[in-house]
Amino acid sequence: MRLFLVYFVILNILFSISAMAEKPYHHVYENGKFKKFRNYQGAPERNKNFKWSYKKFREAKKNINVIVPKDFVVPRKTVLENLEKYKNEDFILWINHASFIIKLGSTTIVTDLITAPNAGPLFLGPRRYTPPALELDQLPKIDLWLNSHLHYDHLSISDIRNFPYKSAKVLVPLNNGSYFKKNNFKDIKELDWFDTVQINKDLSITLTPSQHWNKRSALPFGPGATDKALWGSFLIDYKDIKIFFACDTGYSNIYKMMGKKFDGI
């Protein structure tokens, strides 16, 4: 019996070591348990002076009087007219920040949708200087939602909650899906870097690395904790067209790698 237990313990240890060895570099484990995600192997670490420089930027920003030029924003009427005019063609429409509508054949995609008045929890966080090109109730029918990470300027709970097309397919990096699931989205797929989803015979989506990080909550646990959920960019491959939605990223070795891996990007 003792001999059996010894063999059992040894096999468990060997299995755990083997399983950990198979994990990608960006999956960090500690004592056999998942700890966090990290950037692509060989990517630079964040400079220790970043917080200091960001603090100085925020202080200086308070003294800047932001004036939006009169003709800077395309009138909503023009946006809606063009949406109707080109509804049977492929197009890309910029809503704001990282929010785009991309129509490719019969599939209409939205990326990192945010139309909320502020980027933060409840009423907190930076507020808009300009309105979005479209409000939620003015969006065309969306078939596919791509979301890159959980930062408040890329994921809006009010937009998820009030989104009119809950039947849309949602593609997100690992551990990002719960925010959609809680708000009645049914078709949610979490991806690791380099996972590809075939949407139809002409369209595929691949999650690719980005040089960034993830956080949504001050709590040390759950998907909103620092780097507990993965982040990424998306490669949209449609017929002979490639669209790279880089989203939030710094420069690193990932771009040379992806240039070699994905011909024609």
Give the ranges of each region predicted by the language model.
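Metallo-beta-lactamase
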Residues: 17-138, 236-247, 263-264
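Bacterial N-terminal signal peptides
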Residues: 7-15
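Flexible, acidic/histidine-containing loops and adjacent segments that form or flank the divalent-metal
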Residues: 189-191, 196-227, 239
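Short, polar loop motifs at secondary-structure junctions
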Residues: 173-179, 192-194
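Active-site metal-binding loops of divalent metal-dependent hydrolases
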Residues: 113-115, 150, 210-211, 247-249
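Active-site-proximal loop/helix segments of hydrolase catalytic cores
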Residues: 158, 214-265
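Active-site metal-binding motif and surrounding structural segment of the metallo-beta-lactamase
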Residues: 124-172, 187, 260-265
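Positively charged n-region of N-terminal signal peptides that target proteins for export
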Residues: 1-4
